[in-house]
Each structure stands twice: as C-alpha cells, then as structure tokens.
C-alpha cells in the first residue's frame, strides 16, 4: 500500500466538540481512570489492507498541538477552565496507546490508557480511516462534486418545505467522523453557512473557529458507559453520570444522550430535578417518532412545558428525514437536527463507511452500550450485559456485537 507522507490532520481541534467537553470533565473528576476502546466496522467492509497507512497517520498525529490562536479561541468560550486549557496546551497524542492490525483482512484497532488522554483518539482516527479508504478507492472525487450534490439536496429541501413554517428548523453539522475528507467537510459546511439560513453550528471545533460558527455537542455514550464502573452501584450509574455532568456544566451544554441503556431506562432515571436542569435530550437509536413522543409525554407528566425544551435528533439523518420529523414535532417542542454522514459523505457512487470506536472497558472491567437499536449493542462480556439488564429492569435480550 502506497503511503502518503503528508498528515491528513493538521489541527488538534479537528474533532467533535463533545470530546473536549467530556475531556475537561474527565480531567477534573476522573484523571486516573483507565479505559479501553475498540474499532468496529458495522458493514461487511474489509479494511485491514489499510492498516499500515493508518498506523503511519497515527504516528503523524503525535505532532499535533494546540496553537496559540486555538488556545485563545477556546479561552474565549464559556465552557472551559484555565487549568484544563493549560493542560490541553501541553497535550500530545501518544501513538503507543493505539494498536492497529490486519486480521485476515479485517481492521483491528484497540486503544488503551488514561481516559483523559485516550478520549481524543476516536473522532480524528475515524476521520483518518474514512479519508484513507475513500482517497484510495475514489481518487476522482472533488469538493465541487460534493457541493453540487448538496445544492440539489437543498433545492429538494426547499421544495418539500414550501408548504410549512420552516423558520424553526435548525441544522447542525455532525459530519467529522465519517466524512469523505477534511477538504470536503470544509466545503460542505462553508456552503451551508452561505446558502442555508437554518445552519446553527458544527460539532467540529476547527471548522467552528475558522468559519465563525457555534461549536455544538455535549456528551457521548462513553460518558455513561464509564460510569457503569465508576458508580459503586450499577443501577445508579446513569444518575451518577447525569449529576456529574451538571456538576461540571451547571448552566450550559445541557443536552443528555438517552440511549446508552435504553430510552425507557433513561426516563426512569430522568426525574423532575434532572428534567428541569437539562435543556433537552438527544436521540441516537431506535424509532425517532416513538422516542420523541416518549420525551414529550415525560416532560408533560413532570409538569414541564415541552416547548421550553429541545429534542436533538442525530441518528442516521438526512435532510428529508429531518424535515419529516420537523413536520411531526415542530409545534410541540423545540428541535435541532444533527446530520453527519449524509452531509459530508453524500456523493454519487460513494458508499460511506459505517465505522465506530466504542468504549469496552473502564478500569479493566467491562462496560456496555445497549441502545434502542439491537444492531448497535456493544459489549465483550455477555454476563455484564445480563447484569446491566437486571440492574435497569430491562426485558428483552439483545445480542451483543
């Protein structure tokens, strides 16, 4: 495999905002906790042939460091404290934390180390894998081609939305991890900023800084997964995670991800105190309409006006699906739509990679993500899945991947 000597990534901020938001919370609360995370390809792609090139890019990532301009930019945001930013300034990726191998054609990647350090690997590494694969398979693709496709999708959106009040539609770019390339994500988000008045932000800190957009993102599944071993009582782990997040961010970044266990298990823990303090909820698996109806009913049961809260939908969306959800809900609750792959790798003839990196251990003990979609369940240890299901009073067994 021919290697491109130049680095794909050129900024430490070329990552999802929630990684820095979680990293600060881990830095302040759980600095000595260790974790392990693993790569999964949910499709039938054999990516092992790219292992050497991926390893080369991982080595180059050790050169990334926060620049003075980036430090000043983060300092001007309301989220970060000086102790964390000074630590981040000295942070460097450590390639020894990542093992990459070609296992009979399958790509195996395992990341181990301190949570506060390894937390930053996932998003840029997935972006690197995606770009390497697409660059090798589809060298002919240009940013102009991607933007041309986006233009036609925006025209379609405008036609489909002509009969309703679309002024409350809000779009966020969530496209870093499975983008075709860094160049194409930049071109897509730039075009949206210029041509689509409903773009409210991007999850990518580098793009947010360069394009003067709001950075968006709160926490990921790993926040809740790690607390399965941090919390002394497993059944309390979700509440412990929700409270720890509020302790770190009392008045901001208040959107909670609901499907680490399941939506039903989440709502049992999401009492009036949490529901009042969190600004909203994020959907990432299962039927989105059913989920939204459950969220609205829960707020109403607690005596909270759903129009004072925000539902963020981010599971495999495109503009058409987002518009359908908007039609269903917009008069009853505030809405935001996070679209990723269908923005930054939506190119005729190109099949996006369905790849993830997920936590599998915390302090050498198993953790699990169950989710509201059976195919998204991740855990090494069937006995721990059973323990988790029992702790959260879950019925049906779902097969772990």
UniProtKB/Swiss-Prot annotation:
Pathway: Cofactor biosynthesis; NAD(+) biosynthesis; nicotinate D-ribonucleotide from nicotinate: step 1/1. One of its GO terms (molecular function) is nicotinate phosphoribosyltransferase activity. Transmembrane segments: none annotated. It is an enzyme of class 6 (ligase). Keywords: Ligase, Phosphoprotein, Pyridine nucleotide biosynthesis. One of its GO terms (biological process) is NAD biosynthetic process via the salvage pathway. GO terms for cellular component: cytosol. It comes from the Bacteria. Its EC number is 6.3.4.21. InterPro entries: N/Namide_PRibTrfase (IPR041525), NAPRTase_N (IPR040727), Nic_PRibTrfase (IPR006406), Nic_PRibTrfase-Fam (IPR007229), Nicotinate_pribotase-like_C (IPR036068). The modification Phosphohistidine is found at residue 221. It catalyses: nicotinate + 5-phospho-alpha-D-ribose 1-diphosphate + ATP + H2O = nicotinate beta-D-ribonucleotide + ADP + phosphate + diphosphate. Transiently phosphorylated on a His residue during the reaction cycle. Phosphorylation strongly increases the affinity for substrates and increases the rate of nicotinate D-ribonucleotide production. Dephosphorylation regenerates the low-affinity form of the enzyme, leading to product release. Belongs to the NAPRTase family. Catalyzes the synthesis of beta-nicotinate D-ribonucleotide from nicotinate and 5-phospho-D-ribose 1-phosphate at the expense of ATP. HAMAP family: NAPRTase. This is Nicotinate phosphoribosyltransferase. It comes from Yersinia enterocolitica serotype O:8 / biotype 1B (strain NCTC 13174 / 8081).
């Amino acid at each position: 495999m021919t290697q491109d000597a130049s680095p794909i990534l050129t900024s430490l901020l070329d990552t999802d905002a929630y990684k820095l938001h979680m990293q600060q919370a881990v830095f302040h609360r759980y600095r000595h906790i260790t974790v392990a995370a693993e790569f999964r390809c949910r499709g039938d792609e054999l990516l092992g042939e790219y292992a050497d090139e991926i390893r080369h890019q991982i080595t180059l990532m050790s050169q990334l460091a926060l620049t003075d301009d980036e430090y000043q930019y983060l300092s001007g945001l309301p989220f970060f404290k000086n102790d964390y930013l000074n630590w981040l300034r000295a942070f460097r990726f450590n390639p020894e934390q990542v093992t990459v191998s070609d296992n009979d054609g399958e790509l195996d990647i395992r990341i181990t180390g301190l949570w506060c350090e390894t937390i930053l690997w996932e998003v840029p590494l997935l972006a690197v894998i995606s770009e390497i694969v697409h660059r090798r398979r589809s060298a002919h693709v240009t940013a102009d081609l991607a933007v041309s496709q986006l233009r036609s999708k925006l025209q379609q959106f405008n036609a489909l939305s002509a009969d309703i009040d679309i002024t409350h539609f809000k779009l966020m770019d969530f496209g870093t991890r499975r983008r075709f390339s860094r160049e194409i994500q930049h071109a897509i988000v730039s075009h949206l900023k210029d041509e689509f008045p409903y773009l409210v932000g991007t999850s990518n800190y580098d793009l947010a800084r360069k394009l003067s957009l709001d950075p968006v993102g709160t926490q990921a599944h790993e926040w809740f997964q790690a607390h399965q071993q941090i919390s002394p009582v497993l059944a309390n782990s979700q509440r412990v995670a929700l409270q720890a997040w509020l302790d770190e961010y009392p008045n901001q970044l208040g959107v909670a991800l609901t499907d680490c266990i399941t939506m039903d298990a989440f709502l049992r823990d999401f009492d009036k105190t949490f529901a009042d303090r969190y600004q909203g909820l994020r959907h990432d698996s299962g039927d989105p309409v059913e989920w939204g109806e459950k969220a609205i009913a829960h707020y109403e049961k607690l005596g909270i006006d759903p129009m004072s809260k925000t539902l963020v939908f981010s599971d495999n969306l495109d503009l058409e699906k987002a518009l359908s959800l908007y039609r269903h809900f917009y008069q009853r609750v505030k809405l935001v739509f996070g679209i990723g792959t269908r923005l930054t790798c939506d190119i005729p003839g190109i099949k996006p990679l369905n790849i993830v990196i997920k936590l599998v251990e915390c302090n050498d003990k198993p953790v699990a993500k169950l989710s509201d979609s059976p195919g998204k369940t991740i855990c090494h240890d069937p006995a721990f899945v059973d323990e988790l299901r029992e702790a959260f009073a879950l019925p049906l067994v779902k097969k772990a991947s």
